From Swiss-Prot:
It is found in: Cell membrane. GO terms for cellular component: plasma membrane. Residues 1-30 form the signal peptide. The lineage of its organism: Eukaryota, Viridiplantae, Streptophyta, Embryophyta, Tracheophyta. SMART domains: LRR_SD22 (SM00365), LRR_TYP (SM00369). Residues 31-666 are extracellular. The gene is RLP43. It comes from the Eukaryota. Glycans are attached at residues 78, 114, 143, 167, 191, 239, 242, 252, 263, 295, 323, 347, 362, 372, 420, 466, 550, 590, 598. It comes from Arabidopsis thaliana (Mouse-ear cress). PANTHER family: DNA DAMAGE-REPAIR/TOLERATION PROTEIN DRT100 (PTHR48060), NON-SPECIFIC SERINE_THREONINE PROTEIN KINASE (PTHR48060:SF24). Residues 688-711 are cytoplasmic. This is Receptor-like protein 43. Keywords: Cell membrane, Glycoprotein, Leucine-rich repeat, Membrane, Receptor, Repeat, Signal, Transmembrane, Transmembrane helix. LRR repeats lie at residues 120-143, 144-168, 170-192, 193-216, 218-240, 241-266, 268-288, 289-316, 317-334, 335-358, 360-384, 386-406, 407-430, 431-452, 453-476, 519-543, 544-567, 568-591, 593-616.
Length: 711
């Protein structure tokens, strides 16, 4: 009986759980059908919808938005409950709209002071980012006192931020990034005591930043970069004990690095670049326990104070374009977690410190270009480097053969040094090498046996390379050969990392251009200023991804290969200052992206290809050739060209053939009189006076011969 009651009790408990589950589940199922939306909230949303147009995606949508689409387009269509509209969230009990997320919604138009958004009094979250809104929005939202999250980034909002911004006292997140806000930041910003993130970058703010910022004790992120703030950093920033990120770059802040930054013990990222800071870098900066990223570039700092004991947390140190002098400071070798070191464009001298071998476990990007460093490249100190740039120094010797073991190396730039070596064909073993720059050194010899599978940019110009290039030379240059899809191009990234991006200088379209960032789809080949001879390899036509091709200032001969017409992505072509002859291949006229070309100072002749690209070239691109002609050249370049209709032009091949013909004609012309003269003389010798002939011709010749023999 006891077992029966136990069993009955168990059943009762089980049924109770089932009933409870069903009742809860039915509530869940019924919830979407409940009409929560309050009428005045619905009206405000519908009016807001009519205030703006749905247009094209904003310029940044395709990059930053996951699924951009017009969210307001479906509002009101067969659904009267605004709480179920896309981008709208309501309070489950009261039906008040508390969140409005219209980011990436293709919305276009100008905000006015009476915008219906001001009637959504209970909003806590408002996200209008990644649209094309214009005008002044602040007067429309200054009374939304419940807001905790406000994101207006990536729009075209303008005007000043009013002092009434301080009324939004519950804000924890304020993002005005990438707009056109102007004027001074009001001191009432200090009333936002709950704020954790303040993002004002990429606007037109100016003047001194308000010292009231020191009252935001919860602030973790302060981003002010790309504005026109000036003066010294407010000392009250030293009170922000929770601050982890401080970005002040590209303003007009000035002075020395203030000591109160040493109070920011939680700081992980500090960017002071592109301002007017000066003096020495204080030693205490390297003792901040959590500091991971420091950017001091583009200021006028002159040196480093040595720290007592640097913290090992430092991962990225960028100090380019300052006035640093002397040797590279040795304390850098103690930053064992360093992944990026950029000290380019300074006045450092001496050797590259061997102690940098301490960094080999983590260092992936090293940039020391544009200094006065001397000696050779150290061996065996960089194991996992992805990019090495030591261009524009005074380095000597040879490339260390240990480079062939740098299996992660993607970029190698040693341009404008005094390196005296043969072509490093052994670098073909590097599986990830994409950029190789050897220009302006003393490299010499042939460059055969080179096949690079990943190489996309190679610049070996202005060296002493020589010899011929086999016809199949470029067959194995895979990265320049495979045509990328439109999707590949749209998804192209820049070489480098989040904290550092590779750069280089390249001759493009006749101008020395600096690539501040290198796209992963950019391709270029520059062999100019060497002593290459023979024909241009026909396999050049396999490099269908090539954008820039420069073979100028060599001794190439023969015809320009028609296979160049297959370089469908080509934008710049320079084959000037060679010994090329024949016609410019008509196929080149079909290259629709080719905007700059130079065929000058060769022995080219014949009809210049048609096509709009050729019509827009300057006369200097064709000057000093044997006889190029075409309607444009005859009309616009008469000073350097004679129309072919008035003159017959000959290539070196036809000149040789003509010389042969002329020689045969001359021989024939001389042959007939010779026969006549010979017969006449013979007739005289036989029938008339042989004594006279001997007297006239024979004795003088014999006398001369005997005189020569005697002597």
């Amino acid at each position: 009986m006891k077992g029966f009651w136990n069993s009955k009790s168990t059943i009762r408990i089980t049924l109770s759980f089932i009933f409870l589950f069903i009742s809860q589940f039915s509530d869940v199922l019924a919830a979407p059908t409940r009409h929560l939306c309050r009428p005045e909230q619905k009206d405000a949303l519908l009016k807001f919808k009519t205030e703006f147009e749905i247009g094209k995606p904003c310029r940044y949508c395709t990059v930053y938005c996951i699924e951009p689409h017009p969210k307001t387009e479906s509002w009101g269509n067969n659904n009267s409950d605004c709480c179920n509209w896309e981008g709208v969230t309501c309070n489950a009990k009261s039906g008040e709209v508390i969140e409005l997320d219209l980011s990436c919604s293709y919305l276009h138009g100008r905000f006015h002071s009476n915008s219906s958004i001001r009637n959504l009094h209970f909003l806590t979250t408002l996200d209008l980012s990644f649209n094309d809104f214009k005008g002044q929005i602040m007067s429309s939202i200054e009374n939304l006192s419940h807001l905790t999250y406000l994101d207006l980034s990536f729009n075209h909002f303008s005007g000043q931020v009013p002092s009434s911004i301080g009324n939004l006292s519950h804000l924890t997140f304020l993002d005005l990034y990438c707009n056109q806000f102007s004027g001074q930041v009001p001191s009432s910003i200090g009333n936002l005591s709950h704020l954790t993130t303040l993002e004002l970058s990429f606007n037109r703010f100016f003047g001194q930043f308000p010292s009231s910022i020191g009252g935001l004790s919860h602030l973790t992120t302060l981003n002010l970069f790309v504005n026109n703030f000036l003066g010294q950093i407010p000392s009250s920033i030293g009170n922000l004990s929770n601050l982890t990120s401080l970005y002040l770059c590209k303003n007009n802040f000035s002075g020395q690095i203030p000591s109160f930054i040493g109070n920011l013990s939680q700081l992980t990222r500090l960017d002071l670049s592109s301002n007017n800071f000066f003096g020495e870098i204080p030693g205490w900066l390297w003792t901040l326990p959590n500091l991971f990223y420091v950017n001091l570039s583009y200021n006028t700092f002159i040196g480093f104070q040595r720290p007592n004991k640097p913290e090992p947390s430092m991962g990225h140190l960028l100090g380019s374009n300052n006035n640093f002098t002397g040797k590279i400071p040795s304390f850098i070798c103690e930053l064992r977690s360093l992944e990026t070191l950029d000290l380019s464009d300074n006045n450092f001298s001496g050797l590259i410190p061997r102690c940098m071998g301490n960094l080999k476990s983590n260092l992936s990007h090293l940039n020391l270009r544009q200094n006065n460093l001397s000696g050779g490249l150290p061996k065996h100190i960089f194991e996992i480097l992805r990019s090495l740039d030591v261009g524009h120094n005074q380095l000597v010797g040879k490339l260390p053969r240990s480079l062939r073991f740098f299996s992660t190396l993607e970029v190698l730039n040693v341009e404008s040094n005094r390196i005296n070596d043969t072509f490093p064909f052994w670098l073909t073993s590097l599986p990830k090498l994409q950029v190789l720059v050897l220009r302006s050194n003393a490299f010499h010899g042939p460059i055969h046996e080179a096949s690079f599978l990943k190489l996309r940019i190679i610049d070996i110009s202005h060296n002493h390379f020589n010899g011929t290039l086999p016809s199949d030379y470029f067959v194995k240059w895979s990265a320049m050969s495979s045509l990328g899809t439109d999707e590949d191009r749209s998804n192209a990234n820049y070489m480098g990392s989040v904290y550092y991006q590779d750069s280089m200088v390249l001759m493009n379209k006749g101008v020395e251009s600096e690539l501040i960032r290198i796209l992963t789809i950019y391709t270029a080949l520059d062999f100019s200023g060497n002593k290459f001879e023979g024909e241009i390899p026909k396999s050049i036509g396999l490099l269908k991804e090539l954008l820039v091709l420069n073979l100028s200032n060599n001794a190439f001969t023969g015809h320009i290969p028609s296979s160049m017409g297959k370089l469908t992505a080509l934008e710049s072509l320079d084959v000037s200052q060679n010994k090329l002859y024949g016609e410019i291949p008509q196929e080149i006229g079909n290259l629709s992206f080719l905007s700059c070309m130079n065929f000058s100072h060769n022995q080219l002749a014949g009809l210049v290809p048609g096509g709009q690209q050729f019509l827009t070239q300057p006369c200097s691109s064709f000057e000093d050739n044997l006889g190029l002609f075409g309607s444009t050249l005859e009309e616009d370049c008469r000073d350097i060209h004679t129309p072919a209709s008035h003159q017959q032009y000959k290539t070196p091949e036809t000149e040789e053939e003509d010389e042969e013909v002329i020689s045969w004609i001359a021989a024939a012309i001389g042959f007939i009189p010779g026969i006549v003269l010979g017969l006449t003389i013979g007739y005289i010798l036989v029938f008339y006076k042989p004594e006279w002939f001997i007297k006239t011709f024979g004795r003088n010749n014999c006398r001369r011969r005997s005189t020569t023999t005697t002597h």
